[in-house]
Amino acid sequence: MSDLLSVFLHLLLLFKLVAPVTFRHHRYDDLVRTLYKVQNECPGITRVYSIGRSVEGRHLYVLEFSDHPGIHEPLEPEVKYVGNMHGNEALGRELMLQLSEFLCEEFRNRNQRIVQLIQDTRIHILPSMNPDGYEVAAAQGPNKPGYLVGRNNANGVDLNRNFPDLNTYIYYNEKYGGPNHHLPLPDNWKSQVEPETRAVIRWMHSFNFVLSANLHGGAVVANYPYDKSFEHRVRGVRRTASTPTPDDKLFQKLAKVYSYAHGWMFQGWNCGDYFPDGITNGASWYSLSKGMQDFNYLHTNCFEITLELSCDKFPPEEELQREWLGNREALIQFLEQVHQGIKGMVLDENYNNLANAVISVSGINHDVTSGDHGDYFRLLLPGIYTVSATAPGYDPETVTVTVGPAEPTLVNFHLKRSIPQVSPVRRAPSRRHGVRAKVQPQARKKEMEMRQLQRGPA
């Protein structure tokens, strides 16, 4: 009898581990169990890892999908989804759990589209960036009067207003000249941000992310950078001046891909507001400083948009299945957008990888860099481009590239070491005919002239 009971309990445990994700709200412990359940179902293509802890000590868990989990494969792009940045905006969290189960199940069912996506892409899913805030919101539940309860982290900070402000620097550089990518962090940045923000920034430093989406609630629209308005003039009710990035057309296309694959976002009229094509420039909607999507673009190689996915910030459980069906195709199509533009390796004469080489596209004032393995990824719309690769100590290389509408174009660069140019010593004629007087080097000459100016006329 005890043997039968043991077998029954084992089968019950096994059933709990492989049961599909249900359409309900998952508290922190449920979320963790769900992530490990998916890993148990698909151990060959998944990995659960933590990028840090929240203020109250909860792990910020990520579920990775890859045919080689835990390993970066050169020329395979990295893409991420971030959910539940605002603790009371719960739909993104649940969609990420449903997406995780869907990818696992469809891979096991040999759905060729999903198999190819996982073989060609390294996908990172962070269901909850703000688990502390979620627990506060979940304790209140949906349809309660506290609209903003649980929005912030445990220290009362809005995490989407907590990243270092790099927009101020890029707007200055665009006007007066300066770097157009990978803007440095302030020296004291760690003391200015919350633990959750710090963890995400370190996560960005650990992976060469190419594409990302940040899932929110309270509206239905695909929002693209910049979020912070360059001009603070108001152009209508709740509207400020549009502030496009150098990649504005590309960002619009990424936003439209999600909007038109979504069940109803593309219609424009949602939640009492109207957005043509279901998309908006962030600053055109309202100006937001220290946001995450602008930070991605200005500090890393990553192109991120913000997805507002539901009128209700914390929708009732009976709406979750409808929301999943409305977002499923859009979530997959957006992941597939990482496979466009150009990609390749940057190598030296001996075929060694060159990290941190700068890839520039003529006419687009935003560069990207090669990763630690020497591979780079540059999202571009179809067209003909002039592309250059540069690295300190090497001669630049420039090529003309045709980008098609489907797969990315492979463009490798082989950079040769620069040969130092030695300037010949210039000599001036002496005042005496036929005799040349030796002159000082240029730096010494300038120094003597400066001293003469300081002394004044003799």
UniProtKB/Swiss-Prot annotation:
Zn(2+) binds at residues 86, 89, 216. The active site is at 308 (proton donor/acceptor). GO terms for biological process: bradykinin catabolic process; peptide metabolic process; protein catabolic process; protein processing; response to glucocorticoid. It catalyses: Release of a C-terminal basic amino acid, preferentially lysine. Residues 24-338 form the Peptidase M14 domain. SUPFAM superfamilies: Carboxypeptidase regulatory domain-like, Zn-dependent exopeptidases. Synthesized in the liver and secreted in plasma. It is an enzyme of class 3 (hydrolase). Glycans are attached at residues 400, 402, 409. Residues 423-458 are annotated as: Disordered. Its main location: secreted. Keywords: Carboxypeptidase, Disease variant, Disulfide bond, Glycoprotein, Hydrolase, Metal-binding, Metalloprotease, Protease, Secreted, Signal, Zinc. Binds 1 zinc ion per subunit. It is found in: Secreted, Extracellular space. Its EC number is 3.4.17.3. Belongs to the peptidase M14 family. It is linked to Carboxypeptidase N deficiency: An autosomal recessive disorder characterized by angioedema, acute or chronic urticaria, and hay fever or asthma. Affected individuals have levels of carboxypeptidase N below the reference range. This is Carboxypeptidase N catalytic chain.
